[in-house]
């Protein structure tokens, strides 16, 4: 029996691919033991606990790296690894994972890193030489590493089952009219107050122009967002604001166009589904990595880049009117699919098997 440990936390961009990969392995090797490490009382614990064994570390911040609390987290990580004795770890890099990586190096445990973004994060760049290899989502990412022999283009770990479903069927399952166009709006797993604020101003305009709208608000922002809007009236015309979209694959499958952040996992899903979008990168992302993610799509004609400091309701209307064209959407959809990597989980699964066989 192989004991595999996933390390992920922070945002859906790290946690969702980890969970997707774990599910893929579970289906193909049900005898393998699969566990997760993340932060206590966190987003990832809520998402994972009950499905897989979850081990929580005390929450630490990137600013704590030079503080005692970080070294205590390494001590806790060493204890957990000693108890679990994993054969291999899969790490989805962020500052949260550093104590586990350090503990793995100390205990000489093999680990893979997965880099979702075009621009590799600091954790990936710092520790990749100690790893079995880095699985990357974009071919452009290889250029940021000196030791390219450790870099493997697998693609992101995206569920593909629903992304190949019929668009009309997906709309129907989501509760929308299958004969009308559907706009998906998401500010990421946490939502975006800025995107929500500007979108709210143009909902009547969009509805009058035939759009149905599925809008992920974010759980923290939902109550304040819906206050004062004619929610029942707008709902009758096809507007559905929700705190969190539980089945994002279904939403992506049913959508004709999107307004979205430019997280790597979101982009991977959009590309596979052939979903063009207006990308509004999160402005506080390290090294502006969401801008680089979006540019990969924009340069092939698969969407539009709109910086948050340029975002306003008038600009959104201009861009949405530009993209409200069947021929333009069809060409963009095809461009997205051409650069997509649909078999990321299979590629990484084969890589794990190869490394494990080479160990024996």
From Swiss-Prot:
Q: Which GO terms describe its cellular component?
A: plasma membrane
Which catalytic reaction applies to this protein? di-trans,octa-cis-undecaprenyl diphospho-N-acetyl-alpha-D-muramoyl-L-alanyl-D-glutamyl-meso-2,6-diaminopimeloyl-D-alanyl-D-alanine + UDP-N-acetyl-alpha-D-glucosamine = di-trans,octa-cis-undecaprenyl diphospho-[N-acetyl-alpha-D-glucosaminyl-(1->4)]-N-acetyl-alpha-D-muramoyl-L-alanyl-D-glutamyl-meso-2,6-diaminopimeloyl-D-alanyl-D-alanine + UDP + H(+)
Where's it found, cell-wise?
Cell inner membrane
- Residues the entry annotates as binding UDP-N-acetyl-alpha-D-glucosamine: 11-13, 117, 159, 189, 245, 290
**The protein's Enzyme Commission number:** 2.4.1.227
Q: Which HAMAP family match?
A: MurG
Record's function text? Cell wall formation. Catalyzes the transfer of a GlcNAc subunit on undecaprenyl-pyrophosphoryl-MurNAc-pentapeptide (lipid intermediate I) to form undecaprenyl-pyrophosphoryl-MurNAc-(pentapeptide)GlcNAc (lipid intermediate II).
Family of this protein: Belongs to the glycosyltransferase 28 family. MurG subfamily.
The molecule here is called UDP-N-acetylglucosamine--N-acetylmuramyl-(pentapeptide) pyrophosphoryl-undecaprenol N-acetylglucosamine transferase
Q: Which gene produces this protein?
A: murG
């Amino acid at each position: 029996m192989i004991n595999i440990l996933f390390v992920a936390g922070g945002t859906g961009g790290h946690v969702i691919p980890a969970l997707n990969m774990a599910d893929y392995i579970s289906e193909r090797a049900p005898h393998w033991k699969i566990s997760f490490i993340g932060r206590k009382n966190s987003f990832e614990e809520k998402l994972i606990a009950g499905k897989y064994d979850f081990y929580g570390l005390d929450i630490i911040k990137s600013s704590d790296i030079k503080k005692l609390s970080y070294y205590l987290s390494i001590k806790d990580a060493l204890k957990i690894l000693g108890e679990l004795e994993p054969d291999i770890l899969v790490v989805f890099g962020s500052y949260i994972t550093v104590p586990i990586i350090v503990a793995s190096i100390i205990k000489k445990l093999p680990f893979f890193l997965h880099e979702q973004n075009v621009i590799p994060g600091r954790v990936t760049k710092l520790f990749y030489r100690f790893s079995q290899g880095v699985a990357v989502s974009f071919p452009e990412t290889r250029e940021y590493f000196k030791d390219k022999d450790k870099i493997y283009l697998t693609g992101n770990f995206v569920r593909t089952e629903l992304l190949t479903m019929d668009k009309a069927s997906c709309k129907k399952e989501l509760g929308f009219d299958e004969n009308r166009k559907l706009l998906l709006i998401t500010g990421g797993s946490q939502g975006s107050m800025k995107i929500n604020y500007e979108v709210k101003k143009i909902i009547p305009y969009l509805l009058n122009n035939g759009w149905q709208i599925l809008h992920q608000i974010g759980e923290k922002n939902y109550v304040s967002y819906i206050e004062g809007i004619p929610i029942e009236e707008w709902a009758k015309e096809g507007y559905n604001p929700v705190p969190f979209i539980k089945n994002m694959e279904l939403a992506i499958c049913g959508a004709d166009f999107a307004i979205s952040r430019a997280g790597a996992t979101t982009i991977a899903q959009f590309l596979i589904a052939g979903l063009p979008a207006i990308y509004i990168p999160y402005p506080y992302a390290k090294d502006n990595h969401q801008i680089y993610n979006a540019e990969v799509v924009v340069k092939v004609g698969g969407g539009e880049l709109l910086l948050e400091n340029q975002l306003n309701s008038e600009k959104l209307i201009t861009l949405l009117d530009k993209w409200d064209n069947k021929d333009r959407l069809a060409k963009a959809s095809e461009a997205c699919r051409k650069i997509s990597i649909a078999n990321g989980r299979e590629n990484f699964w084969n890589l794990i098997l190869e490394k494990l066989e080479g160990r024996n």
